[in-house]
Amino acid sequence: MAEAAVVAWVRGPGTVWKALPCASVGCSVRDVIYRHCQEQEVPVECFFVTCNGVLVNAGDKVQHGAVYSLEPRLRGGKGGFGSMLRALGAQIEKTTNREACRDLSGRRLRDVNHEKAMAEWVKQQAEREAEKEQRRLERLQRKLAEPAHCFTSPDYQRQCHEMAERLEDSVLKGMQAASSKMVSAEITETRKRPNKSKTDQETSAKKRKRKCFWLGMDGLEAAEGSSTGSSEDSSEDDSEDAPGTSEQSCCAREDGIDAVEVAADRPGSPRSSASGTHSESPEKLQCPVTEPGQGILENTGTEPGETSDKECNERKTVTDPEETPARKETESHEATEKDQKTGMSGGDRAAMVLSGEDRKSVPAANLEGNNSGDTALGLEAVDLSAFSSAAELESLGLERLKCELMVLGLKCGGTLQERAARLFSVRGLTKELIDPALFAKPSKGKKK
């Protein structure tokens, strides 16, 4: 009997199923697969053969009715992924947070847990609103409720009553003591204050009307008037405690008169006529004349209340009235000799005697005197019209150019060329036409 033909089923690549008959019973799997790959036009080396999920060797015989599958070969990687899996497994075992994991439906556990918490919060929303309203009502009731203050302390109340009684008694005693002191003070004043005689009133009126020619002592007249008025209103007891007040004003007047007379005796004094007229008044008091201008210095340095009684008495008793004119002439003669030696003019000496307001005008007068001082020192004024250029002015020298610039009130610093150019630029110009930037700045006083 003829042998039956062997038929094998081959699947692949893909989902292609095909029955391949074998020419002989001893046909191998390699022959069948080779013929199938030729028909499908795919390389044999890219597949391996499995039968019922088991890898089949290429030299085995073909079984009748068996299904052979062609599985594509996969290229292998570098490796090392296993170590990563082991590290991830160890980390998963150590942590307790499973929110990054997924459930069987593929959702993350974090999202699932958030949904559950949100549902619980929405359910409790009504309860929270009710609790909030309850707290608001309780707070409002506490504010509206009246304070239940119940403080009962008999000791405290007793102390309050005692303090009020003591305070009332103390106030009454103080008022009684004050009224008794006021009454006693009025009685003593009426006893100690006698009636003033008409002679005393006339004397005080004369003192009030008497005025002296003061030099820079305008404030002393006001002080004298206030002291005289206050002395009339004060009691005799107070006047006995300070007996030197009237004598101080007397000495101050006498010192001022003597100083005015000394200034009047000097030549060129601007106040000689006024002081001489005042010195001939019949109300002049005679006091000793010390050094010239000493009375003025003492009066300007001290107030009338600072002069002691002893100094006033010594001034009254040291010299006689007859010696005063002789000493005045001697001192005026000595002052004239000193002026001649020191070169001080009469106007300068009179400026020393002037008050603070008069002294302000003295520097301006001295400045005008300095403008003509070059002629007195033997230096003639430079005629700028005789020079045709600044280079010719340089022949005068630094010091001479400085002097000329100072006379004009201009800046005197700089080099020889700068000074000559500055002086030449103002040639033939009046003071109003000169550039203000060329004038020297006024010197500032020293800060104390």
From Swiss-Prot:
The SAP domain extends over 393-427
Q: List the disulfide bonds.
A: none
Presence of the UniProt keyword Ubl conjugation in the record: yes
PTM sites of type Phosphoserine: S269, S281, S332
Q: Where is this region: Disordered?
A: 175-252, 264-372
Query: In Gene Ontology terms, what is one molecular function of this protein?
Result: snoRNA binding
- List the record's Gene Ontology CC terms alphabetically: cytoplasm; cytosol; Golgi apparatus; nuclear speck; nucleus; plasma membrane
Q: In which domain of life is the source organism classified?
A: Eukaryota
> Is the keyword Nucleus in the record?
yes
Regions of biased composition (Polar residues) lie at: 270-279
Site keyed Cleavage: positions? G77, K78
- Note on domains (UniProt): The PIP-box (PCNA interacting peptide) motif mediates both the interaction with PCNA and cleavage of the SDE2 precursor by a deubiquitinating enzyme.
Q: What is this protein called?
A: Splicing regulator SDE2
Q: Which gene encodes it?
A: Sde2
